Structure formats: C-alpha cells, structure tokens
C-alpha cells in the first residue's frame, strides 16, 4: 500500500450486511471523531439510503466524504432507538448532529426534596435535589400528567422565591389546582400524604394506589363526607384511564444484561443496563485474551472484575452459564444491601433482552476488528513515513493547555498499533514556571514523565515515537528534557499546523530540521492527527477542570470567615461562584451561616469594594 492511499469506506457493502432491525448508527471520521448519530426503524434500509445515489445537500456530501467507519447498535423497537439516539447526542455531541438537531433533552417530572415539595417539568442536568421520574418520550404526555396531578392532588408548582414570599393564596388555589401550602391552608400531614400518593402514581404503582383510594372513599362515605368521596372517585377514574407508566421502557426495573462474543482470538463483552425501568444503553468491553478461553470463562472473569468495582443490580442476566456463578452470587449478595441473582435460560421479555445483547455483542466485535485492521494500516504508514525498521508498538504525544497562563496542564496520551491505551494517559499540573511559558511547561512535563520511567526502569513503557504538538522550539525543549533524564532511544517528531493552521496541512518536523508534508489523504497523517487531537482534548479538559476548581474556590477561600462549610452552602444556594457574585448582600445574608456583616464582606471582596463602599451600595440598592 502506498503512503498516500486514503482509507475508503464502502457504505453499500456495510449496509448490505446489516439487519432490518431497529437501532442506532454512528458515523466516524479518520481521526475517530464522531460525525453523526441517527436512529432507524430498519438499519439496513436507513444506512443504505446514505450511499444510494447523490447526497441531497452539501452538508450531507461533506459529512459522507469524511466517513471511514460506522458502528450500529440494535434495539428492541424504534422508541428505544429514539431515546438511545438522544442520549448519545447529548453525551457525545457529534459534529453534524449539533448543527442540525433539536438540542432539547427528554423531559422528566421533578418532585423536589423539601418540606413542602414542588412538582414540575424538568429538562437538562439533574442538579436540583429531588426525585426525577422519566425520561418521557414527549413533553405533551408530561404536561397532561402534571395537569392531572395538580387537579387531583393539588401539589404546588411555584418556585421557592415565590413560595416563600406569599401572603395570600394565588390563582392556582382559586381554580382548584393547588392546596396553598404557602399560607398553611393545608396541613403539613395532609400535604405529605398527597406527595406520597403522587409518588406511587409516578412509580407506576396504580394498583396499590387504587386500593388505598377505594378504602379512603369507603371511609369518607361512612362518615357522610360525600364531597371527599366524590373527589376520590374522580381520582380513581382518572388513574384507571392512565397508563401505569409512560417511560420509553418501563418493564425491566433494575437489571444488567451481559453477553460475550468471540472471534479470531478477540472477544467483546456487551453490557445492557436498565435502571428504574429506563434503558441506559449499551457499553462494549474488549478484554485481552490469549485466544484460547471459552466465552463462558471470559464472561465469568468480566463479571467478577466489573462488579468488584461497580455495585451490581438485583438481577444480572447472562447469555450462558458461567463458572463459579454460585460463588459470585454469594459474594455479591454479601457486599450488597440486597440479594443478587445471576440468571440465564430466561423466558419472555428477559429472553428478548438477552438476545438483543448477543446480537449487539456480535456486531460490536465485528466492528472493532474492522477498526483495528484500519488502525494497523495507519500505524504501518507512520512506520514507513518515519523510516522505522520495526513495527510501531507504542507512541505518545504531549500537549499544553492554559488560559493566559492560568491553570496550566500538560497531557500525555498513549497509542499502540490498534488505538488509544486510555489506562496509561497522564495529566501533569504545571507549577513553578512563568505563566504562559509553553516551553518551560513542555520541558517540565516530559522530565516528570520520563524521570519516573528511568527511576523505575520501565523500558517497556518508553515510546517508539514521541509526538510534540508544536514546532521546532517545542521540539528542542522536549530534547532537552529527555537529555536531562538520560533517555536517548526515543524518536522525537514535532507536529506543526503551519501558518494557515488547517487540518490536513500539518508539517512534521524532525530534530535535524527535516520537514515532512504527508498530505491530507495520507493514512500516516490520519494516525498522527488522531493522536495529536486526542492529546489536545485530554489537555484542555484537564485545564478546564483545574481552572474551574480554582475559580470556584479560591475567591471565597480568601475571604476571612469563610470556611469549607460556609463556602459549600454559598455555592449550593446560588449554583456556583457566578451566582454568588450576581447576588445582592440581602440575598447572600439569607444563606445558612452567613450574617449581615459577613454578607457585606463577601460582596465587597467579590466586587473589589471596601467594606464601607459595600455597605453604602447596599443602602442605595
């Protein structure tokens, strides 16, 4: 294969081997960037539509030109595919989905955890303390449900800022949709009972709730409380007209489903998880094997190791019997608050879940093997480009990230011939240098990484090639760092984007000053871009986390009288430092543990005022 031969993707051939089952498909670029996530009622038909004929628009043309591989996940039905698609888009932010799709998340019903709980529709991060029911497939169903809950159970929907400042009942009370807990029209015991009934309703325990309502209705009738009995009758009628549950999948409760596929000495363990009846999607694991283990042995080893780290659900379904299952059940049950059951040869719906996991494990393994073959082609192209005699076993790449010298972080990512080795990634918090000095940061990071390897004599952890994100200056600093720790057998290569800073136009810089220009279509450059971009991603996420932590805590920690507990109360109350800074002194003083004098001190410190100026500002406001 020549060095400049691009890796092409035969979409028609890929689609021809897919099933007509519903599912989700993902498209990837050469550097493993996720381009697009979509759902399909019939995977083969939907995927084939992308590659039959001319693309309908320039966006689609541009996207398909970048595709080098695809993954698919089979689901039980299209509704599950819809939810899984949304979860992947929200968590992975594919390049083309972000531009084109509605970025709303699926709605939940939120029941807050307060003395007088509030019920409301909720989207987005689940940061408000309380219980979240869902996700639901559409907002209309949630609004209809909330309308029924307000009408029959009369829970409040107002924000706390409104609730705390009411002096008389609002319009919701007047039209019979709220019991006015804000002004104590309803007793706390009665309101708590209403909350309990709403919880049963949202949990899908309509039968249990109906029995309670029938008994309460009989008691009301016996006591001649006919209006109360009529209200309970209406509530019972409404309950029976509603579905027990409106989750996308509310049948599985809490359980994990595991299946193992093996081929050509490689294995894949697929985990399908359900929590509170919600399909959380799949995760794929590719354990290293010697090629001789049976799938049952691989699965047994996985179960033992995985659930030693993560708490198991009450029920774990397997695609086959595994060795030591009785021992594993006993061990898991002893360390858990509930009994753990490992099951196989199941029937009904659970058999369908196992079959689903088996099919997805087979597809995932096939896709992984194809991806590894492509990665080996790129790795071999790098070897040829750099003139190495032996196949590449390990490469590393360093990058630096900071904001105007603040919170500098260096990253080191590791790749072998078949892809990233994430367990060996490292970050280095850079200290003791002039802020913004990238050269000093690079030198410090490389010295720290290789000094440890030299001290521990870890020859196997030394890379064949060390890529540096930068030009000749950064490359020189890397060489100085290696010399300082006595490492000589590592090939250093700088990766420079040049003046135009366009992807595909990178220049590779060698220590002797030689420059290589592989070209955008080169598999070697595609491999190097993937490594470099991963180093950049890993550095910038570490930098942002460090910067956020510094900004969230240091300004409050510097204020006399603010300890860890008061700082936590402030950040929790206002949702972060930005919220504290935006608040007035009166609002700050309402936080638990914050006096009026301390609130003035906090306000002054965050706004660069003297304490007297802060007091005056408070009087003016």
From Swiss-Prot:
<dbReference type="Pfam" id="PF22920">
    <property type="entry name" value="UvrC_RNaseH"/>
</dbReference>
<dbReference type="GO" id="GO:0003677">
    <property type="term" value="F:DNA binding"/>
</dbReference>
<protein>
    <recommendedName>
        <fullName>UvrABC system protein C</fullName>
    </recommendedName>
</protein>
<keyword id="KW-0228">DNA excision</keyword>
<dbReference type="InterPro" id="IPR035901">
    <property type="entry name" value="GIY-YIG_endonuc_sf"/>
</dbReference>
<keyword id="KW-0227">DNA damage</keyword>
<dbReference type="GO" id="GO:0006289">
    <property type="term" value="P:nucleotide-excision repair"/>
</dbReference>
<dbReference type="GO" id="GO:0005737">
    <property type="term" value="C:cytoplasm"/>
</dbReference>
<dbReference type="InterPro" id="IPR036876">
    <property type="entry name" value="UVR_dom_sf"/>
</dbReference>
<dbReference type="Pfam" id="PF01541">
    <property type="entry name" value="GIY-YIG"/>
</dbReference>
<dbReference type="GO" id="GO:0009432">
    <property type="term" value="P:SOS response"/>
</dbReference>
<dbReference type="InterPro" id="IPR038476">
    <property type="entry name" value="UvrC_RNase_H_dom_sf"/>
</dbReference>
<dbReference type="InterPro" id="IPR000305">
    <property type="entry name" value="GIY-YIG_endonuc"/>
</dbReference>
<comment type="similarity">
    <text>Belongs to the UvrC family.</text>
</comment>
<dbReference type="Pfam" id="PF02151">
    <property type="entry name" value="UVR"/>
</dbReference>
<keyword id="KW-0742">SOS response</keyword>
<dbReference type="GO" id="GO:0009380">
    <property type="term" value="C:excinuclease repair complex"/>
</dbReference>
<dbReference type="InterPro" id="IPR001943">
    <property type="entry name" value="UVR_dom"/>
</dbReference>
<dbReference type="InterPro" id="IPR004791">
    <property type="entry name" value="UvrC"/>
</dbReference>
<dbReference type="InterPro" id="IPR010994">
    <property type="entry name" value="RuvA_2-like"/>
</dbReference>
<feature type="domain" description="UVR">
    <location>
        <begin position="207"/>
        <end position="242"/>
    </location>
</feature>
<dbReference type="InterPro" id="IPR050066">
    <property type="entry name" value="UvrABC_protein_C"/>
</dbReference>
<dbReference type="InterPro" id="IPR001162">
    <property type="entry name" value="UvrC_RNase_H_dom"/>
</dbReference>
<dbReference type="Pfam" id="PF14520">
    <property type="entry name" value="HHH_5"/>
</dbReference>
<keyword id="KW-0234">DNA repair</keyword>
<dbReference type="Pfam" id="PF08459">
    <property type="entry name" value="UvrC_RNaseH_dom"/>
</dbReference>
<keyword id="KW-0963">Cytoplasm</keyword>
<comment type="function">
    <text>The UvrABC repair system catalyzes the recognition and processing of DNA lesions. UvrC both incises the 5' and 3' sides of the lesion. The N-terminal half is responsible for the 3' incision and the C-terminal half is responsible for the 5' incision.</text>
</comment>
<dbReference type="InterPro" id="IPR003583">
    <property type="entry name" value="Hlx-hairpin-Hlx_DNA-bd_motif"/>
</dbReference>
<comment type="subunit">
    <text>Interacts with UvrB in an incision complex.</text>
</comment>
<dbReference type="GO" id="GO:0009381">
    <property type="term" value="F:excinuclease ABC activity"/>
</dbReference>
<feature type="domain" description="GIY-YIG">
    <location>
        <begin position="20"/>
        <end position="98"/>
    </location>
</feature>
<keyword id="KW-0267">Excision nuclease</keyword>
<dbReference type="InterPro" id="IPR047296">
    <property type="entry name" value="GIY-YIG_UvrC_Cho"/>
</dbReference>
